[in-house]
Amino acid sequence: MKAVVAALAANLGIALAKFAAFLITGSASMLAESVHSVADTGNEVLLRIGRGRSRRARTAEHPFGFGRERYFYAFVVAVMLFTVGAVFSIYDGIHKILSPSELTSPIVAYVVLGLSFVLEGFSLRTAIREANLVRRPGHGWRQFVHLTKTPELPVVLLEDSAALIGLVFAFLGVLLSELTGHDEWDGVGSVGVGLLLACAAFIVGYETKSLLIGESASEETTAQIVAALEGGPEKFRLIHLRTSHIGPDNLLVAGKIGVPAELTAADLTAGIDAAEKRVRAAVPIAETIYLEPDIYRPGQEDPLDPSVAVVERSTRRPRFRSSRRS
């Protein structure tokens, strides 16, 4: 994934430059930004590890594969952002406010912050371009972060956005310290960076927690599955449907279908096979499908089904009350 590689390269170079600037200037804001970039670098490494491990072949112990490794490592990123980035930055900022020390060579900090802004902007632009390839038309960035099943892009987007805002905080901290002669402002800048990282960590953790628990298919994908199941000559009727993302590209589909009483066992088997083929043709990521047949009786449909809330049988067109990630 280009966005992760670009972010990794940018953060590694930025971390070294910021730490050198901290050693020269003694700025708490620069130290906070150094730790921020180190945390981001570690995060990109974790995302790559998770992506690699998710591709392992399924085993007897993990029959559905390892797709959720990507969600787990994205959650670890949130933990790192909070513990390594936010907590340290806030602690160091408070220490600088209580025990201020004079900045030296602030021009070095300005140069490094400017260079960092350019590199972080390049990384964010790469992430935006890659996200636009999969973002649905009409969906804003907030919807994209909330609805996507791919964890790496939202993490990189949030990291890079937080990094750019954090650079502004650090710049203001150094600038106000120099203009006012009160070095406490440098500590305030560090605290601002820490609070920003805490917010980013909360958002990443909240979204990846939901994915780790297991999210259903999106409304659009569910509609395609229902249409595929009921759209064949077998005259199947959906009673209830359960879907769960095993990974971004692996969807588990389990459903109970009502079948005509006159179907023979051979016809039923052939019909279920045909229905599964239609589902996979409509939704290629539906790798695992389980269908339980039952004799159809009117009114048998589950009205409280969380995936298919309302199915208008007269028009054969499904409507849904819920909407989840794409």
Q: Where do the protein language model's features map onto the residues?
A:
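Residues that define the loop-to-transmembrane-helix transition and helix capping
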Residues: 1, 27-30, 183-187
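Alpha-helical transmembrane segments and adjacent TM-loop junctions that form the membrane-embedded core
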Residues: 69-326
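Acidic (Asp/Glu-rich) catalytic motifs at the cytosolic membrane interface
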Residues: 23-52, 90, 94, 154-168
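Alpha-helical transmembrane segments of integral membrane proteins, especially early/N-terminal helices
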Residues: 1-6, 35-45, 72-84, 118
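Topogenic membrane-insertion module of multi-pass membrane proteins
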Residues: 1-17
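Aspartate-rich (DDxxD/NDxxD/DxxxD) Mg2+/diphosphate-binding motifs
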Residues: 47-69, 99
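Short, charged cytosolic
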Residues: 40-55, 131-141
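Hydrophobic alpha-helical membrane-embedded segments
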Residues: 12-20, 25, 33-37, 41-46, ...
